Amino acid sequence: MKLLVIGSGGREHALAWRLAKTPGLQRIFVAPGNAGTARERELENVDITDPRALADFAEQERVLLTVVGPEAPLADGIVNLFRARGLRIFGPTKEAAQLESSKDFAKRFMARHNIPTARFATFSERASAHAHIDRHGAPIVIK
């Protein structure tokens, strides 16, 4: 059994390290990995970041499951791509990843489903944002 962990941070290192304890595991690939994962005997760094190339790699290596750590590949739709190719992958779809990747989407989702959240407003033009600040004053948080 082979697994692929996508990411280069400490979270992915910890995840891959723990997954390496799985009985019957042949190999864990980490793409692209980091200096820490490079030192782990059970892990193999793979210098690939392109989603299509990662899917190709998963197919060629017959990876049983891919786990995605970072937000960016999720927001870019890597789960959708892998699933469209019949590959097993753990993580939210591009659409669901917006809860993490888009503050506006998350706030609107919470409002729509009556989930408590701070008041918010979203602007696409600077003048509208300034007018809102002038009307409501401080304290205010801008993101």
List PLM regions with ranges.
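ATP-binding N-terminal substructure of ATP-dependent carboxylate-amine bond-forming enzymes
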Residues: 1-95, 127
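Active-site nucleotide/adenylate-binding loops and adjacent lid/helix of ATP-dependent enzymes
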Residues: 4-5, 99-142
